């Protein structure tokens, strides 16, 4: 992570700003978070902004700092960009005349993000299963943006796809491109039918009762935000392979993801 404008950067890892310098006019590494904030008109943070509700997300815990520390360093007239910003942080920042822009509030970013997420989820499935996706029976839990993107790409790989959702509109849309659609409450009854299960729902529908019915050769790819939608302790006890795959866009399509964030940030800066 770099907190920067076009002049200063605070790197979360040594030499982490070298690649940034290729794309902006001047980049100077700041010796501290305070120094970076003082000399920056805009502060750019990651998506998610925080994973535990207390600290800004960083790759290395050595460089951890709290969101409250950052909040107290922001000054009136600055802009802060991040994804999934807690409402309390937004409120306090606004009271201090700091403009806050949340990636999650943009209409287009979640759509682009879902594409990278879907491709990453499928990559994880290919990497961790000895079976082809081709002609395999796959379950996708949820049919929001990420669920839709996963289903669309699985069908492109000739997989047999069933969608589980309790939303009537989602169920109707799923029936257009998926092979079958079921209510989420029926997941336990059908869990043993699938070789791959992709979860996008941020609630624990894949509980111990459901896991007992999952085939031992199946693979569960869970992309739901923490703590995820799987009872991981039960999965381990039962010998079920379940992976909690977060940050897939940054892992599998960092350049594309960064480009979309850059466009979002620039659009807000030009308007302000």
For every predicted segment, state its role.
Residues 50-52, 65-74, 174-250:
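Rossmann-like adenosine-cofactor binding region
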Residues 84-101, 223-270:
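Rossmann-fold NAD(P)-binding glycine/threonine-rich loop
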Residues 153-154:
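Aromatic pocket-lining residues of Rossmann-like dinucleotide-binding sites
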Residues 25-34, 180-186:
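Short acidic-hydrophobic, aromatic-tinged amphipathic segments that line or gate anion-handling sites
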Residues 7-23, 157-177:
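NAD(P)-binding Rossmann-fold cofactor-contacting core
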Residues 1-6:
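Conserved small/polar residues in nucleotide/adenosyl-binding loops
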Residues 146:
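Hydrophobic/small residue at the entry helix of a nucleotide-binding pocket
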Residues 45-135, 245, 264:
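Glycine/serine-rich phosphate-binding loop and adjoining beta1-alpha1 elements at the start
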């Amino acid at each position: 992570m770099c907190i920067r404008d076009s002049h200063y950067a605070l790197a979360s890892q040594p030499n982490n700003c070298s690649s940034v310098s290729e794309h902006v006019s001047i980049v100077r590494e700041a010796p501290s978070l305070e120094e970076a904030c003082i000399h920056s008109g805009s502060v750019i943070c990651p998506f998610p902004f925080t994973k535990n509700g207390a600290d800004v997300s960083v790759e290395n815990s050595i460089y951890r700092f709290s969101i409250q520390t950052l909040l107290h360093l922001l000054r009136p007239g600055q802009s802060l960009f991040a994804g999934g910003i807690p409402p309390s942080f937004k409120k306090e920042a606004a009271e201090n005349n700091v403009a806050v822009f949340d990636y999650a509030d943009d209409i287009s970013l979640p759509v682009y993000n879902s594409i990278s997420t879907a491709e990453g989820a499928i990559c994880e499935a290919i990497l961790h299963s000895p079976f082809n996706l081709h002609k395999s029976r796959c379950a996708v839990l949820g049919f929001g943006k990420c669920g839709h993107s996963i289903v669309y790409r699985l069908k492109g790989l000739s997989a047999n796809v069933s969608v589980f959702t309790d939303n009537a509109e989602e169920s109707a849309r799923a029936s257009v491109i998926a092979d079958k659609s079921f209510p989420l409450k029926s997941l336990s009854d059908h869990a043993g039918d699938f070789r791959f299960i992709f979860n996008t729902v941020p609630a624990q529908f894949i509980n111990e009762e459901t896991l007992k019915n999952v085939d031992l050769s199946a693979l569960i790819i869970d992309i739901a935000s923490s703590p995820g939608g799987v009872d991981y302790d039960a999965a381990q006890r039962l010998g079920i392979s379940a992976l909690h795959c977060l940050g897939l866009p940054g892992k599998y399509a960092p350049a594309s993801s960064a480009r979309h964030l850059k466009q979002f940030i620039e659009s807000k800066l030009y308007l302000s």
